[in-house]
Regions:
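A non-catalytic, helix-rich entry segment at domain boundaries
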Residues: 38-111
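Short amphipathic alpha-helical segments and their helix-coil junctions
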Residues: 1-6, 10-25, 61-71, 138-142, ...
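Nuclease catalytic cores
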Residues: 5-51, 84, 230-233
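Active-site catalytic microenvironments for nucleophilic, acid-base chemistry
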Residues: 41-45, 165-170
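Structural motif
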Residues: 2-3, 22-32, 153-155, 220-226
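Short, compositionally biased low-complexity segments
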Residues: 6-18, 34, 50-69, 174-186
């Protein structure tokens, strides 16, 4: 059997879990998606050519993505120009963040990973992987452009994101930072929000995913009070109220 982070998220509707923990992902607009794709393309090109990222390179990537796609979205030339100016401000913001400099080198773009959980394969995807060289143990940074309007707490508690972190974990002493990068239309700024997952937390995630995998495989609905009965297993994880990631 193959599972995805969405499968994990959709399955966790146990009534024993704290109320208000469900996260509904807001979809990106076409413009927001193109902003993320332009940054990824520029990062990938720099990685392949072993060159340094700058605003001009992101704008070049933007032009290759944006203008050919505008006709299919019925975006007129004037609107396309205005949005290009807006996008350029986001790209300038990105280049000002530490995440774009040599302390956070990009090692891969559009990456898929998988991990065996019991008799099941958990398959995940992340937009970009960077390494944080500002710390002695070189922490992994997972960069996501696909979600928006999530706080650090939302990121830390979301079952799908936690499953993704687990699949990219390489060792017991590894700390992983999950970073969400999104344009903010209200402030016209590129916003970076993140949560840090330490080794102990990642081990708790493994236990949670293992338990959910068994429920899916055995067709046990954790959202059915009749089937849950007096079971306190979900509550025993405390993974939705643990502050280790914040």
């Amino acid at each position: 059997m193959i599972l995805t982070p969405d499968d994990i998220s959709n399955f966790l509707y146990c009534p024993l879990l704290p109320k208000g923990t469900e996260v509904v992902y807001k979809k990106n607009t076409f413009f927001e998606s193109c902003v993320g794709e332009a940054i990824k393309l520029a990062e990938r090109n720099c990685l392949l050519k072993d060159s340094v990222l700058n605003n001009k390179k992101i704008i070049t990537a933007w032009d290759n993505i944006w203008w050919p796609a505008c006709p299919s979205q019925n975006i007129d030339f004037k609107t396309a120009q205005d949005l290009t100016v807006k996008a350029s401000r986001y790209f300038l913001d990105y280049c000002k963040y530490d995440i774009s400099d040599c302390l956070y080198p990009t090692i891969a773009v559009n990456v898929e990973s998988q991990v065996n959980i019991n008799s099941t394969i958990l398959k995940t995807h992340i937009d970009m992987i960077k390494v944080d060289l500002s710390v002695s143990n070189k922490n992994m940074v997972l960069v996501d452009f696909s979600k928006k309007d999530m706080s650090s707490i939302d990121i830390a508690l979301d079952p799908g994101i936690r499953s993704t972190v687990l699949s990219f974990s390489q060792g017991k002493n590894e700390t992983i930072q999950y970073m969400l990068i999104q344009p903010n239309s209200k402030t016209n700024k590129l916003v970076i929000t993140s949560a840090i997952f330490r080794p102990k937390e990642i081990e708790n995630i493994r236990k949670m995913v293992s338990y959910v995998e068994q429920g899916i495989r055995r067709n046990i609905s954790y959202g059915n009070r009749w089937q849950c009965k007096e079971c306190q297993k979900c509550k025993s994880f405390k993974y939705l109220t643990n502050n280790d990631s914040l």
